[in-house]
């Protein structure tokens, strides 16, 4: 499984945060990983570890997103866009294995696949502001 596919699985799990109580997310993660029958144990562990790292920093990530958008708050954003931003901001700010350009490009690709018509440009703009403010 390539990094893009792993990232997409992390996105799908992170998306559940918006709809599940926090205390149920560990069970949700286990159920999701159980369904990935073709995934290797190392891939499942990568997904689990990265999800946990992002979930731990969600509040800090949301603060960075809120500071980068004018007239928007994470509470008003579409859930798909917010989830993509959370994943990408984590990669830009804390994941040294992922180059910034790759994180942004992958986020835009996820937005094209799962978001609305304006999602790719919105995601690109927010991430650009975050990267430029570093």
Residue ranges and their predicted role:
Residues 1-120, 124-134:
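N-terminal interaction/assembly modules
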